Regions:
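Short glycine/proline-rich turn/loop motifs
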Residues: 1-2, 76-82
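Extreme N-terminal tail/first-helix region
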Residues: 1-16
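Generic detector of well-ordered alpha-helical segments enriched in charged/polar residues
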Residues: 8-12, 61, 90, 113
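Hydrophobic alpha-helical core bundles mediating ligand binding, dimerization, or RNAP-core interactions
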Residues: 15, 19, 26, 93, ...
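Short secondary-structure junctions
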Residues: 26-30, 108
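Acidic/histidine-rich alpha-helical segments that form the ligand environment
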Residues: 80-116, 124-137, 142
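Short, contiguous alpha-helical
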Residues: 12-16, 23, 31-77, 118-175
Length: 175
């Protein structure tokens, strides 16, 4: 497999992994919990999702031909008003990820060396993708942490439980 295909396969896998972490977090939360904030000026899960989705639509719509910071995006608004309910949030979440996956599927050996722009700053394709992968992983980590704080003892872990690494590794290495 050549570098372009391997890289695109790898980032698609990682983006899907972070989407799954978000999906699994949301499945554990109520309508009220997605709106909860730690303090007055902090963001709720719903607001963070609105920001991620706004970023996804801006960055990945016409990825190869337009600046990633679209004139129609209102970033500040993403943090003011959140979704009115969980269903609305999940619908937007799915559309944001679909926009990203659709854009990645257009990439190939013929356009992989193109230059793209984000806020009028030149990026290689891998650099632009890595930038977004880092951005989304940062925010998904926030979503998971808030979910874990809210659920407490009822939280269903999304990773290897404390004290279970040895058993987990035994399964991985003995299979």
């Amino acid at each position: 497999m050549d570098f372009t295909k391997e890289y695109l396969h790898s980032v698609m896998f990682e983006f899907k992994r972070y989407k799954t972490l978000g999906d699994t977090t949301f499945s554990q939360l109520s309508e009220e919990e997605i709106q909860w904030t730690y303090q007055k000026n902090e963001n709720s899960i719903s607001q963070i999702v609105k920001h991620i989705v706004g970023n996804m639509h801006s960055r990945w719509t016409n990825f190869l031909t337009e600046d990633g910071e679209k004139t129609w995006r209102n970033r500040d608004e993403e943090f003011i008003n959140s979704y009115t309910n969980k269903k609305e949030m999940l619908t937007a979440w799915e559309k944001g990820w679909q926009c990203l996956f659709n854009a990645l599927e257009t990439l190939n050996e013929n356009n992989f060396t193109s230059t793209v722009y984000i806020r009028n700053e030149e990026h290689s394709i891998p650099n632009a993708i890595n930038r977004q992968l880092a951005h989304y992983s940062y925010h998904v980590g926030q979503l998971v942490l808030i979910g874990k704080m809210l659920k407490g003892e009822q939280w269903i872990s999304l990773s290897i439980l404390k004290g279970e690494s040895e058993a987990f590794n035994a399964l991985k290495f003995n299979s």
